[in-house]
Structure formats: C-alpha cells, structure tokens
Amino acid sequence: PAMRAWSFYADDPENSKTAHDMGIIMGTSHHEPMARNHQEWARKRKQYGVWDYATNQKVLDRFFREGIERVKDTEDLITIGMRGDGDAPMGGKEGADHEYVNRDEYNMNLLKKVIKNQRKIIKDVTGRPADERPQVWAIYKEVQRFYDIGLRVPDDVIMLLCDDNWGNVRRLPNAEERKRPGGWGMYYHVDYVGAPRNSKWLNVTPIQNMWEQLQLTYDYGVDKLWILNVGDLKPMEYPITLFLDMAWNPKRYTADNLLEHPRGFCARQFGEEQADEATRILNLYSKYNGRVTPEMLDCHTYNIETPYDDINVYLK
C-alpha cells in the first residue's frame, strides 16, 4: 500500500479488516518488517528511541510483536529482516550504501539475530510453526551484498530479488538456488524515490525494456511473488497494466507481438480510430523518457549547439 507519510495499518483500523473481508492479501515494503509501517515508528520516535537492534532490541521486539498480533488472523504476507531507519542501510543513510561495506560482517551477524527473533515472535503469537506463515525477505540494495557473501534465511521464506530501481534486474537465481521451497520473487520499480535521483510522476520505463526484464525474470523461475513500486497511479496506468498482464500470463507477449499490448491499451482509452497513433506516441514517449529522465534533464542534454548533433542522433 501507499507509504511516505501514510500508514496502512495505523491510519484506519478498517483498512486491514476491509482488505481481509475482500480477500486481498496485504504486505509491507522491504524496509517495514513484521507488518509495521515505517510511519508508525517515525511518528513516535521520541517515545521509541533509536531504530537500532543492537541497542534497542527490547523496544523493537515489542514493536514487531504488536505488528504480528494485529495481523495474526489475516493472510497478510510478513516481511522479515531489517534495514536502517527509513529505507536506509543498517546504521547508515540513504544513498551511501557503499560507505558501510566495512560494516558488512557486523550487520550480517546482527541481521541473523533479528531474523531468528522475528521467527520466534511469529511462532509465539500465531501459535503455529513459523514456516506455516508466509514470509518474504527482500534482497534489496546492500542486503543483496549480504546474501552474496553468505547470509541465508530459512528455506520456507520467499526470496525477493530486486531491480536496480531503474527497471533493470540486478540478480536472478541459478539452477541450485531455484530449488528453494520458498521460491523467488521480484520487486520492480517504475517509480523511485532515492539517490542519486528521484524518478516519479512520469513513466520513464521503455515498454520493450520492461517486457524483456520481466520475461527474463519469469524464465529464471522467479514466479512466487511480483511486486511493483508504482508511486502515483495515474501517470503509471500503462506500466501497471503491462506488469499485471504479464504476471497473469507471462508468455502471452513475445518480441514479435509485444506492441499489441500498448495498442490494446490505447484502443480501450482512446478508441480504435486513435489507437495506432496513440500507440506510436506512447512507445516513443517511454523510449525517450527512458534515455534521460526529467530529473536528469538539464541545459546540456540534447544540446543543439554542440558539434555532436545530439538532438538529431537521439531522435532518429
């Protein structure tokens, strides 16, 4: 659900109940463990203290337990693990992941403890073995580095791989890794808020790139869970549609018939008479936006005064 200044679970107790009644399985983001939204902590930071398991374990364990108690009678997917305070690396700040490589071993050992205790909380609160409650561990940013150098979670947990925040998949499981009972998932972005630049409010993901990356994802057995970071809904209607249609039927579109998808979308929005031209525009729009996003654009981009004829080269 939406994040930033909002909290799905805390802002209105009817949110979770309504979702459950409608058969909708909810979850939280990669940095919001144990069914707790970040804003629930941020709003009471003076009361709770520092978001650091090494120094504030008692408070954090209670915070985690309250989250599981709240969703124990739902089918909600539980995020386990822990990152820093507010989508940052453990003990660090957003956009500076590389500065904390020398803390990897320390952070890995701390994360092992966090996950072990979280699993115990899940077992204690639900009264069932932890492996009977669906959980996901996001291998996002610096956490992928932990995985690559040896950090592992129990086999029943879904491993959520991620793109690079710009629509390019960072990692896929090999043949041996694909044998995990918990399976694999993908967290994909068409909207991004973070370093080095935001990308929001406009679709900057080329149609062909998104199709190719999601097709690759599926071909490598990453099919247990797909999550799309969409930001604002209205400008992302097309990539949301493509993502959901591919999740429903990953083999429906090929390199040869891919443009049938945006044409079908445009026909529904604008009618058959305008569909061909609208498809052409939509395709070029995402192509050009993907080359240079609005946040990256400046007076030197496609400069008509340079001797390299940038504008005509890129518009071909």
What is the predicted function of each stretch?
Residues 35-37, 88-90, 233-237:
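Short catalytic/ligand-binding loop motif for oxyanion handling, primarily in non-cytosolic enzymes
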Residues 230-276, 280:
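Extended substrate-binding grooves/exosites of carbohydrate-active enzymes
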Residues 13-21, 56-181, 290-297, 305-316:
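Gly/Pro-rich turn-and-neighbor structural signature
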Residues 159, 217, 229, 265:
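Conserved, mostly hydrophobic/aromatic
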Residues 50-57, 101-108, 146, 199-207, ...:
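Hydrophobic alpha-helical scaffolding
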Residues 91-93, 149, 170-172, 196-200, ...:
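Short conserved micro-motifs at the rims of enzyme active sites and ligand-binding pockets
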Residues 1-60, 72, 76, 131, ...:
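Feature activates predominantly on carbohydrate-active enzymes
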Residues 259-316:
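C-terminal non-catalytic alpha-helical accessory regions
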